[in-house]
Amino acid sequence: NEIAITKNVSEGLNLFAASLPWEAGDNVLVCPELEHPNNIYLWFNLARSKGIEVRTIPADEGRMPVAAMGNALDERTRVVTMPSISFAPGFLTDVKSLALAAKQVGALTLVDAAQSIGAIDTNVRDLGIDALAVATQKCLLSLYGFGFLYVRREVAESLVPIHVARYGIDLGEAHETAFAEDELKYQPGALRFDLGNYNYLGATAAATALDLLAGWGMKNVEAHVCGLASKLATGLLELGLPVAGGSPGSHLAHIVSVGESGGGRHYSADDPAMNSLYDHFVAAGIKLSIRSGVLRLSIGVYNQSADIEHVIAAARTWIETKGH
């Protein structure tokens, strides 16, 4: 009962944020440079409707600014939000440290885990977070239109859902059409956020994918994808390409980005060389994206060493033919 069914990450983030008892002057901490836009819009919408303050903290050379966020906390901070892995350049966030800092002032932590669940072994209790949203179309190997919202039971019990439907109401033994005007009892925990009807096709795909991931073991999955990412980052660096974050380290998960973060459009970079490399990769049959000015190569559990070698070989060919 700590998990609600959603359509996507955006719905999960909004359901949680809009259900908090905001007062004018409360604040939320966010690092816009590292967030997907959908974990930015909702806070400015609440600033407009509830009078809250959105405290934007600059990134620390592409990394989550843990120390700066800690310094920005005060007694009016209600939420610290963060990606488990940034939208771009795809670095790991020290979620546990931020959650611990937030607790010191009584603030809640909300995590956008779109880029990590299904690739990185995750234990929400070990992290000490209060809420986490994820969708199934990325590392959970499933479909668009299905997702999960985790809310720690003690937190969920204090929230009044902004949207209510019969799936989120505790009817006990009564028929689903039963309604008593003086009684509105929410389902326990995060179940109060369920709206229904569910995306049953998405649920079927997610159930199968979760069984597969559990069978492989998430520690094994993480070791596999992160090992391949390390090999890719090292190989591209040896070719002289500007790999975000430099040599593999604690920042690296399963995403390797090439180029300089910032600027660019959703499907193009400011640097013509990066656009050229992107086109070369696509022509070589390599699937990747451009986000915030960098080429983002995301490694899945299905990838193998041969895939990494293919990317490195394609990059080498591009350098030789384009003279970069």
Q: Where do the protein language model's features map onto the residues?
A:
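Pyridoxal 5′-phosphate
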Residues: 1-324
